[in-house]
Amino acid sequence: VEGRDLSAKSEEVEPFLEAHLAASPYTPVFMNNTKIGIPGRFANLKTDILMLDDYLTNREGRKVLEMIDATQMMWEAGREERKPVFYFLAGENLHNHYREPTHAEQIAQSYGVVIAGCRGISYFLSLATYPEHYRALVEVNRELLALEDVVLSLEPTPPATIANPLIRSMTRRLGDKLYIIALNADNDQAVEAEIALPASARAAASAEVKFENRKVPVENARILDAFKPLERHVYVIDL
């Protein structure tokens, strides 16, 4: 179901969704909602997957952090029923958007929604027109595919902690490695961040920064690193 929370009545859409769920119980049903529909529980959120289309480039002045916060809103709405969260992010949509995302914006919004709990991403509407945007789509999807087992790992680990609120992060353990995926979610401000590692990484002397061909020292179970606006770092630590 596409965007019906703007053009239909909740009580009309809910039985439509119920009928599809009953007819094909093993095919996931989702409704591509707006930011109005999900907190308003349009059609009682009668879907297997929560999904949102709210675009960074549909008007001027929007920030990547808005996409991240919207993902968190979806995650909270579906948490009790353990519904996965998908996001229809801005891709090439120049017929009704004023521009495409920049290279930095596309990488940041893709990483940002995953860090916030998103487990499915698609890009609206078609392949990028701008070369740097196309390059970003190729890069970020290669990276997220390489991190798929990490992101979905259920191995227990306490999270790394980062005091700066501009840095959004995810901590995962996979086998004998600890992963910290960290993003400066601010469009404009550079950040010097201190990352406090969980006790399992206390003996580490360094961390690989995946996809960047560099290492950073670990001192007193802490990493100090710089983040440009919208920059992501993926730290890998041997345990």
Q: Predicted regions: what is each one?
A:
Residues 196-213:
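Solvent-exposed beta-hairpin/edge-strand motifs
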Residues 32-42, 65-76, 104-109, 165-166:
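Alpha-helical scaffolding within the catalytic cores
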Residues 73-104:
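Active-site clefts of carbohydrate-active enzymes
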Residues 218-239:
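C-terminal beta-strand-rich structural cap/linker in extracellular carbohydrate-active enzymes
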Residues 1-11, 34-40, 44-58:
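Active-site groove signature of glycoside hydrolases
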Residues 163-201, 230:
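Carbohydrate-binding surface patches
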Residues 129-177:
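Glycan-recognition and catalytic regions of carbohydrate-active enzymes
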